[in-house]
Amino acid sequence: MTMIETQLRSLLVTTKPIRDLTIDAVIAATKRAEQRIAPLWPLRYFVAVNPYLGLIDHTFADAAQLLARRTDARMTAPRDFYAQAIKSGRITDADLAAAIADEKLPSPAPASVAALKEFAFSKDPDPATTPLPTIADVATTVTGINWADFVTDAISTWAGAYFDLGQSYWRSPWAQLPAYAAWRAEAAHDRTAQARGVHGMRRALRELPETALETIVTAVKMLNIPEQGLEAYLHRLLLTIHGWASYARYLRWDAELYGGEDHTLTDLLAIRLVWEVALWHSFADRGVAEAWHKCKPELSNEQLTETARYALAGNILLQRAFEKSYQRQLFARLGTARPATTPQRKRVQAAFCIDVRSEIFRRALETTTDDIETIGFAGFFGFPIEYVPLAEVHGGAQCPVLLTPQFVIAEAVDGASTDEVAKIIERRALRQRVAKAWRMFKFAPISCFGFVGPVGLAYLRKLVLDTLGITRPVPHPAQFGLDARTREHVAPILEPGLIGDRPTGMTLEQRVAAAAGALKAMSLTDNFARIVLLAGHGSTTVNNPHATGLDCGACGGHTGEANVRVAVRILNDPAVRTKLKEQGIVIPDDTVFVAALHDTTTDDITIFDKHMIPASHADDLKRLEADLAAAGRLARAERAALLKIDRKADIDRQVRQRSKDWSQVRPEWGLAGCAAFIAAPRDRTAGIKLDGRSFLHSYTWQQDSDFSVLELIMTAPMIVASWINLQYYGSTVDNRLFGSGNKTLHNVVGTLGVLEGNAGDLRVGLPWQSVHDGENYVHEPMRLHVLIEAPIPAMTAIIAKHEQVRQLLDNGWLYLFALDDRGVVTHKYAGNLQWEPV
């Protein structure tokens, strides 16, 4: 039993049942409502999240109806998007017929191709859907004043100060208290609500308890919410502060990941309920009580009108047909890969992240020469670490957010003595303190006026250089406080040690286990090349609050630099190789692992720790660098069209300039377009132009005797890929709810998120400019197509074992197909652990 259940059950002693509503019902409804909210990671590591994560126990169609009723959300593109696809021939009659046959939607729904096409081309708009009512909605209707937006703004203003992570110079005096206690303490002094006409706020604060859980129970009792509508009502309230609720859900996710608890989301729900009670006390006698009594039964009936259900079904069928059209094109390309070559030792094996942006670069690299083999693997390369920068005591988790770091790796300075490192740390700390003090002087509410006059003009040179992209407006956090010489020599230290009382580094046994696991997961256990390149990835942008969203999601929203440098040092260690040999993994003496970083904005490759590469491989390295440079030019040329770059001008210069342009709202397209995840040997896709839309994971099932690697793929990278895909999907089909709006209007709040403008809810998801070029969608909304070359019984067993995987597949949140040894699709997963031939 969790703490929330224990505390709520304790109320049985002091609280009578709410008519037919029991405390158990409140516990269950509160938990379900909170579980419906997907987490939102802060900007410092903005990883992609499936915005429908709390709804995967529903079918896609049922979730669409639920969200339409609870917050007027869309889960499909506008109808004319599909109509245009039909008109252009992209969606065929066969696609429409297949969608109707597969979806099996209940009536009312278009039941024939003719009916579905008639619906697609109809000029009638979709019927309006009225969300479930709240007291704020009713008060808005009755009084003509938008109390719903007022409440959202009020909570958002408070939350921005309370959750601030260091942006504000005047911290909330109650920041150390739990959220609900802090809000009550501030509300006791704040008269904004009364000044705006919510005179019932003081009464609500007096009548409602001082703990969040008791407040939820008491408020539900006062408003007399029916049990069958309680979850819907509480979920609806959380959706009115969706962004802040999502951030609170992240705090809970993070706490639970490390074995703890967090009740901030419950506190936010209680705060929102206090506003409901306050509005009730303020306007009940002005018609709100009567209006609430009339509309409250809607909470127990979430059924849409018949015309709305027909429109929703039609849109879902059109979406399915659109996905069918992509499947048809993708399947036609697969099976046309270059014939597999006779196994022989390659000059270079280059492992990249499975990220869709790597597909373009990998294909370009393979085009430059036939003696390079590329490999796809999650960008943390099997090394889940917390990387602690120099002079810090804590670092970021360099692994997927589904995992916790297993090792703490500290940063050191290569070649420096202990005393020298101590002096470097002291200098960095001093520079950081001075910079912080200077920044406080610049931006503090009082001193900023004295700063602008005498000092402001001195910034003219920097302003010009920043504008021209010659300098960065803000130093990169990883380099801040370090001089140029030191930056060139910082590196991970693997030897066991301590930071405070925390052990750091890895023992030999731990290094061997991690190395073996990584190599097996990459299907790289023999036939090693002379150079094995491990290329993590990151991005280079300026003036971009969501910059970490362009970095590596598998590295927790960081670049993959730390992971590849750690991996390479371990894999080049003779002691590790000796132990690996005992496990049957023999790495030749002339094989050298090399760490690199792929800049996805510029398609440049940076190679790290060149001084550690033996002289015997100098020519190999020089040739590899030439190959990487040539591949970068090819990749930039391919991406130029989508970036609307003038192909007659210098493409390379223009692409690199975008990464330095602080006015550029689209420095790169990120993972826009992502639509497929393929786990198979590279031979199955080699030479096939997949347009940078496919996650490519190398996997050879014949080397996976117990299918543990397959299980890892289907429960980690496949899930992460679906999160990315559905984040882009949600941000495209309903940017109002699941995206972050217009990037040019963003204001960073508390360094943790953005507002669109100066008020409103915290925004989630991606900016509109990340999915749309101003004229057309760049990201085509479609659910992820997973294609795996593995025995069907093995995949079925994994689906049956893991509930989340089964929910995603059985409820239609992603598609799964089986490949044969030619790369041809043979079967599709049909739900309920059944497969059908394709």
UniProtKB/Swiss-Prot annotation:
InterPro entries: DabA (IPR018752). Zn(2+) binds at C353, D355, H537, C552. It is a peripheral membrane protein. Its cofactor is Zn(2+). Its main location: membrane. Belongs to the inorganic carbon transporter (TC 9.A.2) DabA family. This is Probable inorganic carbon transporter subunit DabA. The keyword Flavoprotein does not apply. GO terms for molecular function: zinc ion binding. Disulfide bonds: none annotated. Pfam families: DabA (PF10070). It is found in: Cell membrane. Keywords: Cell membrane, Membrane, Metal-binding, Transport, Zinc. Part of an energy-coupled inorganic carbon pump. It comes from the Bacteria. GO terms for cellular component: plasma membrane. Forms a complex with DabB.
